[in-house]
């Protein structure tokens, strides 16, 4: 029988994110077992950017593993991790829906309610947020990914003007600037030097429609000059609220449009030669619920996604990927306790059939 005692066997956490927090990237990388049908290089080069699978199939662990690979070259590769469930709170989710509402007499009522109309388009709001996250991460670097030229300066200044929060300690938390009746409050002085054609809603030039300023952000971002180095933005925990609630209907729209926003941002990167890669993990149940509403998200998922499914049809049961994963944890535990890794854990730790 094997030398390892049961109490010394490392099984791990039920959640991949918690495992990385508890044990660190080095341990988790040693334990990581690559999904057999996935070429990691396709995630790194942007060929695949949707990771789909049932709950507990290892989507978060895969994201964190890729993030750890990027960290090996932290001088040339940058990353940012967003957790939808944690970083996008209730107020921000409601505000995202309101940002997409057209100007109409009922807007003042909508402001205090949870918008549930699934025909509302929130893609632009998500794009602005993802651009802000990318820019804020790169602001911490002196160079890399984009040339620090006039267009870059304009984009940074415009984002600063519309968010107008110098004390924002966590840029992930604030999804959108303050929006009232579809308009963003901006002072003319803050954008006077940017030479942008903004559609002011009043003579005093204190407010601009979010749609107008949002498109300016996307246009400026699409006009940046790429350079060396890469940045990866990971979006995880795309989960729905409980069924039969307004929050559930709202989240369906938000997740649908976030999926499209990730696609559009990656398209901008490919068209302009940007080394900016967005990767997101999506639960199958979320995908099915969104699709059941008649929302056409199947094409981008099929074209740019990978399905994690550990089921094995036929063959040697000992070659099952999940059992190989378990064997790896036995061997890691042995190494950790100074023992020689067992070549065959089945013959050493389990009774014969």
Language model features with spans:
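The catalytic "switch" region of P-loop NTPases
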Residues: 214-232, 237-353
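Short N-terminal secondary-structure initiator segments
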Residues: 19-55, 163-187, 229-248
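Generic hydrophobic, helix-prone segments enriched in Leu/Val/Ile
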Residues: 9, 162, 188, 258, ...
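Walker A/P-loop-proximal flanking segment of P-loop NTPase domains
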Residues: 1-106
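Short linear interaction motifs
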Residues: 30-35, 40-48, 110-113, 212-216, ...
